[in-house]
Swiss-Prot record:
One of its GO terms (biological process) is DNA-templated transcription. DNA-dependent RNA polymerase catalyzes the transcription of DNA into RNA using the four ribonucleoside triphosphates as substrates. Belongs to the RNA polymerase beta' chain family. Residues 1384-1404 have a biased composition (Acidic residues). Its cofactor is Mg(2+); Zn(2+). Residues 1381-1404 are annotated as: Disordered. This is DNA-directed RNA polymerase subunit beta'. Binds 1 Mg(2+) ion per subunit. CDD domains: RNAP_beta'_C, RNAP_beta'_N. It catalyses: RNA(n) + a ribonucleoside 5'-triphosphate = RNA(n+1) + diphosphate. It comes from Leptospira borgpetersenii serovar Hardjo-bovis (strain JB197). Zn(2+) 2 binds at residues 778, 852, 859, 862. InterPro entries: DNA-dir_RpoC_beta_prime (IPR045867), DNA-dir_RpoC_beta_prime_bact (IPR012754), RNA_pol_asu (IPR000722), RNA_pol_N (IPR006592), RNA_pol_Rpb1_1 (IPR007080), RNA_pol_Rpb1_3 (IPR007066), RNA_pol_Rpb1_3_sf (IPR042102), RNA_pol_Rpb1_4 (IPR007083).
Length: 1404
């Protein structure tokens, strides 16, 4: 027998009237529901037993047949079949309508499908359906065309004139007739022909119409089925009616809606039978149409039908929509049995794989197992009495409970479950009380703390489920964070504090001899006798050598695995995590778990022994604070007076003040930490808590003992009045008031941002849920290049970290020997990465999900390593969901962390100079330099300084026996020459040899430092610069415009009162001339400098402050105007989350920058079209035409007449638009940009996410292409199509000898891409449910159930992990029902950390 769950795909389509009749078991003729006296369903009513089946099992309505033996008999008296009452959930009825009505989904949705087919607008359709206008069906010789609307008078006029030949109609009848007359095939052919004739068609409506026509043609649906003659009635159990106490009834809204339809339908039938006047009948028909509309989709109507208490009734569509709808409430998330929840408390005595389960809960959760066991042991004769025993809580029940619970894993979950580590499995240990006990080290993964958090517990029942739980979900298998491969189980808080105290060292008195010991036992004895302290320096004979260490460190080293290098340093939380990662790398998870439990024990033990506490005295305020604050006040005063004299603007003064306070705050913090460090011999508890990473950050301690510093307003602006006090001294009233801003913003943000982050995660999951690892190798030749990430000069992410866990895409070759070190497709482990780094590579090509060519999902080689286990990913791994969780989870975390600092603002100290931290040689200075009055070299346009790191330099005569030649690459430590005295000279770093003019140099990488206009250069080409020597100086607060020649100023299109505003500063009475936007007039503001016959023009952007008057004389290098840069706002993820959001949604930024479409030379024409300046780019290739570029007048242009630009360069200021990058620079550039930008936001917050997760999502955003030329394919121009389908179709057409289609890639944001998935189930359960289903039904779409969501919805196993196709045929055999047996466990011994297996044996 075929089970109803055994199918591969689901198709959705329009139902024909015959189909609806086929489903139905009878017609519902009366609006009655149940008889108020007998409470039995009324015959022919909405709950009729004859139609829908009996309400009592195996019993007919009248009671003639009353037992299972009459199964299938239909009662001759009442006509009810004797069957199960369950059939009332599946049997449908129908209502025969007296007049056809239109289905609201097809005429009211945008775009209206019916409207597209008939080429009518929604309003026209409505006026026909609602009996306002006639529509022409057959125009005869009237000269009108089919489908035109006419009013009553015209209709009668035409009738009189042309008689029966002229046919027009009104209402749904007419629409149905028109739809039935459409020849879908012919229409579609005609439109295709039209499109080809017109070429490059742009009318979207025609394309849309073609799409709908072809949908009907290909799906076998008939257009007239969109008009209903017969309405299905859903089974009564799905719209139940229940009796409340007090004899009243609660009913589903659908019953009310159905009743209205039946009432109106019956009334219409009567009126037609009575041959009532047309006007009355029409009104009734209109009301029937409205009733059916309300039944199908009440929320779409302007005035929804209201029920009791003025509440809109819930129609069939509303049942599906939204968070409370069928999809999201019941299909994607169900409540499950065998679960419980309780408060959690810490269980420091537990092992890493255990949890404490309260006996009360265990009794309920394991009830069936206990009952079965009681019967097996003959402690109860049958299940029923066993149940009684359990409920009475007899003594033997608890003995059995121990046995049943043993080795039966349970799952713990803490909401919100933001990533897969929010559910983990543990082995239960029974405990007294009512609270669940949780191991302290798994808290971080759950983001749990013990301030009243609750957790839910779930029991896996079947042997298969238990096995999976045990093998995959047990906490020891989840030590690493899937987002980045770092341990997530690191110790925190008291454990860290204990370990830090244990491994720290007391300062020893100078010259005092060290006590010596020969082994660990002696040291223990000495501690017990009080001869030495845990932190005293001693010397000890250990592992064959004499060490200088402390007893505490010796004790700590006993818990590390054998053979691990001796750890001889104080361990903060970061250090401990490093050791955990290292042990995992070298010894695997089993040893790591054992070590974790030992670390936990040690940490708690010694935190208790050393018992640090903090008192107010421990918060030491630095004595230097008063002086520093005094200096700052003087500097602020100075800035104020400069402003009053008019030397600087108010904005500059403000920035200066903020900078002064930021700097002062940093200085105070520094001196405070020095003070704390000296206090109590380096063991000040406040300092230790911060230093060890146990609690508190530098930020927080700075506020306790330094100064609170600058605060931000809710808008993110910084208040320039700094808070000079700290919490130890106490705040003044004003300071307290300023502080409240930040504190409140913190709380408000947390509430709002958590929802945003949750929604981001939901969209990410939705777009990437069907990315599953599907094959071993897709065989692509494509790859991406990954390299070091730098910020200025600092390496933020090393090459090793960047390429870890990827497969190489090319052979890695040793640059010295030219041998292949690692062939293509080598998995890059830490070791491999280190070696590649040592070879001097700063970037290599690796495989990536972005370039993977798998049909479904991605392949192992392109994805690389599974970050949660550091082994290659396996087929069936749901990498898409993991990627989504890895990106979404920190979003939520970070927003929840804003408020801990209490809104203290941090502004960057503005740099005024360019410098590098090493000795360098200036290779080149790009850009136009002019010499000003002070004879300084000034950049008059944007440019750059190219500097190369100088590693070593010798005169050639100082060297003998050169081993290298000019241009050769050298490695660190490579021998390059010997000196005359015979000493070896080796390279200090990887670099390249450079020999010229008798000088031998080893040079490192080049750095290009971009500089802005007005920068003063202090160096010349070929200068050798010292570390941190200022290379160039600039104004950090303003962008400037600089004159390139001496001459006289002439204002052009600058008029005071029109586009120049005179701002008088009230406090200083200085006058500022500021350029403002002028909408009405076509002004192109610029300043010209005229000298003899030559003139130079400079465009002046909006917001510029003009520094010269009309007619002034200026010298080359003088400033003509300044543009103040926007005040720095504080950046936290509050700014960050919206940024991630707009990147993933691919939104166009407000003021997008313009990119150069081609390489070429700029010509600024000076013409203005529609408030935009016009520029031309003359391409390098003379055959190409010049490219016109328009830029809004207000924007600052980055280029000048005669500049050369490269394709993709920014021409004006503004933010990059991802769509432009894709269009101009191509897919690769866009991918790199998106990954980098998203990483940037998270990196600012100190969150590590592996690139591959972001790549998986970006891959999904670039799935579609836009057809630009359809060739001989079945595509239409401007159609969006899946890239894979596009390639397949092209292959087919080429094979048949046709011309292939051409397309451009398009970028879709998360929401758009999710709604465009192949699976309509997935899209419908995401957003816009009715729209998706309408569309799918017309197209007759088939859902092949490839993704995870679709399968969850219909209750299949998901096609990932053990549900993958290739595992479908494997079955698990069990010798006994209940728990896992010994033999199974032995087979899997490898997978289960030894500690667990040992433990479980030892407890019996």
């Amino acid at each position: 027998m075929r089970s109803h769950n055994d199918f591969e795909s689901i198709t959705i389509r329009l139902a024909s009237p015959e189909r609806i009749k086929e489903w139905s078991y009878g017609e519902v003729k009366k609006p009655e529901t149940i008889n108020y006296r007998t409470l039995k369903p009324e015959k022919d009513g909405l709950f009729c037993e004859k139609i829908f089946g009996t309400t009592k099992d195996w019993e007919c309505y009248c009671g003639k047949f009353k037992s299972i033996r009459y199964k299938g008999v239909i009662c001759d008296k009442c006509g009810v079949e004797v069957t199960h009452s369950k059939v009332r959930r599946e049997r449908m009825g129908h209502i025969e309508l007296a007049a056809p009505v239109s289905h609201i989904w097809y005429y009211r949705s945008v775009p209206s499908r019916m409207g597209l087919l008939l080429d009518m607008t929604v309003n026209q359709l409505k006026s026909v359906l609602y009996f306002e206008k006639y529509v022409i069906i057959d125009p005869a010789d009237s000269g009108r065309s089919r489908g035109e609307l006419i009013d009553e008078e015209e209709y009668h006029g035409y009738l009189d004139e042309y008689g029966d030949k002229f046919v027009a109609g009104i209402g749904a009848d007419a629409i149905k007739e028109l739809l039935a007359r459409i020849d879908v095939d012919a229409e579609a052919r005609m439109i295709r022909q039209k499109i080809q004739d017109k070429d490059k068609i742009s009318d979207k409506r025609i394309l849309k119409r073609l799409e709908v026509l072809e949908a009907f043609r290909d799906s076998g649906n008939r257009p007239e089925w969109m008009v209903l003659d017969i309405v299905p009635v859903i089974p009564p159990e799905l719209r139940p009616m229940v009796q409340l106490e007090g004899g009243r009834f609660a009913t589903s809204d659908l019953n009310d809606l159905y009743r209205r339809v039946i009432n109106r339908n019956n009334r219409l039938k009567r009126l037609l039978a009575l041959k009532a006047p047309e006007i009355i009948v029409r009104n009734e028909k209109r009301m029937l149409q409205e009733a059916v509309d309300a039944l199908f989709d009440n929320s779409r109507r302007k005035r929804a039908v209201k029920g009791k208490g003025n509440r809109p009734l819930k129609s069939i569509s509303d049942m599906l929509k939204g968070k409370q709808g069928r999809f999201r409430q019941n299909l994607l998330g169900k409540r499950v049995d065998y679960s419980g929840r309780s408060v959690i408390v810490v269980g420091p005595e537990l092992k890493y794989h255990e949890m404490g389960l309260p006996k009360k809960m265990a009794l309920e959760l394991f009830k069936p197992f206990i009952m079965k066991r009681l019967v097996d042991l003959d402690l109860a004769p049958n299940i029923k009495s066993a149940k009684k025993k359990v409920e009475a809580e007899d003594k033997e029940v608890f003995d059995v409970l121990e046995y049943v619970v043993k080795e039966h894993p349970v799952m713990l979950n803490r909401a919100p479950t933001l990533h897969r580590l929010g559910i983990q499995a543990f082995l239960p240990v029974l405990v007294e009380g009512k609270a669940i006990k949780l191991h302290p080290l798994v808290c971080h993964a759950f983001n749990a703390d013990f301030d009243g958090d609750q957790m839910a517990i779930h029991v896996p029942l079947t042997p298969k489920a238990q096995l999976e739980t045990w093998m995959l979900m047990l906490s020891p298998h989840n030590i690493l964070n899937p987002a980045n491969g770092h341990p997530i189980c690191g110790p925190t808080q008291d454990i860290v504090l204990g370990i830090y105290y244990l491994t720290s060292e007391l300062p020893s008195e100078p010259g005092a001899p060290l006590k010596s010991f020969s082994n660990l036992d002696e040291v223990h004895y000495a501690i017990d006798r009080g001869v030495v302290e845990f932190r005293t320096k001693i010397s000890v004979y250990h592992q064959g050598k004499i060490l200088e260490t402390t007893p505490g460190r010796l004790i700590f080293n006993t818990i590390l695995p054998e053979g691990y290098a001796y750890v001889n340093r104080p361990l903060s939380d970061k250090e401990t995590n490093r050791i955990i990662a290292d042990v995992y790398d070298k010894y695997g998870p089993a040893k790591t778990v054992l070590m974790l439990d030992d670390i936990k024990k040690l940490g708690y033990r010694y935190a208790t022994l050393f018992a640090p506490t903090i008192s107010i005295e421990d918060i030491r305020v630095s004595p230097g604070k008063v002086g520093l604050v005094g200096d700052a006040n003087k500097e602020v005063e100075k800035a104020d007076s400069e402003y009053r004299k008019g030397i600087i603007t108010n904005e500059e003064r403000r920035k200066k003040v903020i900078e002064i306070w930021t700097k002062t705050n940093d200085l105070i913090t520094e001196s405070m930490f020095k003070e704390l460090e000296k206090d109590k011999g380096g063991f000040n508890p406040v300092f230790i808590m911060a230093a060890s990473g146990a609690r508190g950050s530098k930020q927080q301690i700075r506020q306790l003992a330094g100064m609170r510093g600058l605060m931000a307003k809710p808008s993110g602006e910084i208040i320039e009045l700094a808070i000079r006090s700290n919490f130890r001294e106490g705040l003044s009233v004003l300071e307290f008031f300023i502080s409240t801003h930040g504190a409140r913003k913190g709380l408000a943000d947390t509430a709002l941002k958590t929802a945003d982050a949750g929604y981001l995660t939901r969209r990410l999951v939705d777009i990437s849920q069907d990315v599953i690892i599907s094959e071993d190798d897709c065989g692509t030749e494509e790859s991406i290049s990954l390299g070091i990430v730098k910020e200025g000069e600092n390496v933020i992410v090393s090459l090793n970290d960047r390429v870890f866990g990827r497969y190489t895409a090319e052979d890695v070759i040793d640059p010295v020997t030219d041998k292949v070190v690692y062939p293509r497709n080598t998995l890059i482990t830490r070791e491999v990465g280190q070696k590649v780094e040592n070879l001097g590579y700063d970037k290599i090509r690796v495989r990536s999900p972005l370039t993977c060519e798998s049909k479904q999902g991605v392949c192992i080689r392109c994805y690389g390593m599974d970050m949660a286990r550091l082994i290659p990913a396996e087929i069936g791994e749901a990498v898409g969901t993991i990627a989504a969780q890895s990106i979404g989870q920190p979003g939520t975390q970070l927003t929840m962390r804003t408020f801990h600092i209490g809104g203290a603002a941090s502004a960057k100290v503005q740099e005024k100079e360019h410098k590098v931290s090493y000795t360098g040689i200036v290779n080149n200075i790009n850009g136009r330099l002019i010499t000003n009055e002070k004879s300084q070299s000034v950049f008059s346009r944007r440019g750059s300084i190219v500097i190369q790191r100088l590693i070593q330099q010798y005169k050639t005569e100082e060297l003998s026996n050169l081993r290298v030649e000019n241009g050769q690459k050298v490695d660190k430590g490579e021998l390059v020459a010997t000196s005359p005295s015979g000493e070896n000279i080796t390279s200090a770093m990887p670099g390249a040899v450079h020999i010229e003019n008798g000088i031998f140099r080893i040079l490192g990488e080049e750095a290009v430092i971009p500089v802005k206009t007005g920068t003063v250069v202090n160096v010349k080409v070929n200068d050798i610069t010292q570390p941190n020597q200022p290379l160039a100086e600039f104004d950090p607060y303003n962008e400037v415009g600089i004159s390139e020649i001496d001459g006289t100023v002439q204002w052009m299109d600058l008029e005071i009162g029109k586009n120049v505003r005179r701002d008088e500063d009230l406090r200083t009475s200085n006058i500022l001339l500021k350029v403002i936007e002028q909408r009405r007039e076509k002004l192109n503001p610029r300043i010209a400098v005229i000298s003899g016959g030559s003139r130079e023009e400079y465009s002046v952007p909006v917001d510029a402050i003009i520094s010269v008057q009309d007619g002034d004389k200026v010298k080359a290098g003088d400033i003509l105007f300044k543009i103040p840069t926007v005040a720095e706002k504080t950046r936290d993820i509050t700014g960050g989350l919206p940024r991630v959001d707009e990147l993933f949604e691919a939104r166009r930024p407000k003021d997008a920058t313009t990119l150069a479409e081609t390489d070429g030379k700029i010509e600024i024409s000076g013409e203005i079209v529609k408030e935009k300046r016009v520029l031309y780019i003359h391409p390098d290739n003379p055959d190409q035409e010049k490219v016109k570029v328009t830029i809004p007048i207000g924007k600052q242009i980055r280029v000048r007449n005669g500049d050369f630009v490269k394709r993709g360069d920014q021409i004006d200021d503004g933010n990059l638009d991802p769509h432009d990058i894709l269009r101009v620079k191509g897919v690769t550039a866009l991918q790199v940009y998106l990954v980098q930008e998203v990483q940037e936001v998270y990196r600012l917050q100190g969150v590590h996410i592996n690139d591959k997760h972001i790549e998986v999502v970006v891959r999904q955003m670039l799935r579609k292409v836009l057809i630009t030329d359809s060739g001989d394919t079945s595509f239409v121009n401007q159609q969006q199509i899946d890239r894979l389908m596009f390639n397949e179709e092209n292959k087919r057409v080429i094979a048949e000898g046709g011309s292939p289609a051409e397309s451009v890639p398009i970028l879709l944001g998360l929401t758009k891409a999710s709604l465009n998935t192949e699976s309509f189930f997935s899209a419908a359960s995401f957003q816009e449910t009715t729209k998706v289903l309408t569309d799918a039904a017309i197209k007759g779409k088939t859902d092949n159930l490839m993704g995870l969501k679709e399968n969850v919805i219909i209750g299949h196993m998901i096609p990932a992990g053990t549900g993958t196709k290739k595992y479908k045929d494997i079955s698990v055999f069990k010798s006994a029902y209940g728990d896992l047996d010994r033999p199974l466990e032995e087979e899997e011994e490898e997978e289960i950390p030894q500690s667990i297996a040992d433990d479980s044996d030892g407890d019996e």
